[in-house]
C-alpha cells in the first residue's frame, strides 16, 4: 500500500523477511536505487505456550489477546529460587488464564489474569514444610502471628512471600516474585485489588474494603466461588468471579510435590468473624 512517500506492508504470518522497494523511472526523473529492509514479525500463535512473554504482553496491551487464546489455556514457566526459606529448584509449572480484562473498570484494562498453576493438567498449590501449621517462623503463611489483623494489605503473605513489597524489576529478596522467570517479570503489570484491609474481627464494614496495587495476589473468596460466606460482605461489591471458575472448573488443588494429595489453599479475604 503506497500513500505518498509511505509504503505500508501488511504481515500475513510470523517470521523474518527482507522487503525490497523499487520505483520505476518517470517522465521527469530516473529510477532511484532500490531500498531494502529486514523485518521480523511476531504475530501470536493460537497455542499460548508457543508464544514468548513479549508477544503475549503485546496482544494483551492491544486488547486482542482473547482473539488468540481462551480462558484455561496454559503456558509453562520455571520457578527457581529460595522463597522465604523454601528452596524451589527448576520447578516447571503451567500458569493458566483466569480471565481477560477481568473486572477491568476497577482492576485495570488490557490485562490477562493468570493463576499459578498446574503440573500437567493437575491444579497445584505450592506447599512448604510449614503447611498446616501456625507459628512465627518464615514460611508460606498469611502472617507470622496467628491473626488477620491488617487484612490483606499489610499481610506477610502479600508483602514478603509474594513480594509485593518490591516490583518485578526489583523484587523483594527471597520472594516468589524473585523466583519467577525474568522474561515474565519484565511484562508483569499491577492490578487494583479490593479486599478487607482491616480484619481483626471487625465484621461487615464497608470502609474496611480498600484497594491495593498487586503484581502477585491470592484470589478472594468471591473471585473463586461467586458467592460469599466468610469474607466481609462488602468485598463482593468490588469483585467479579473469574471466568475460569464461573465455567465450573475444579477448585481443588493438590500439593505441588505430590499431585495425588489434595491441600487447602489460601485466599486473601479475611474471615469477618475471626481475628
Feature annotation, model-predicted:
Residues 1-43:
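Extracytoplasmic soluble-region selector
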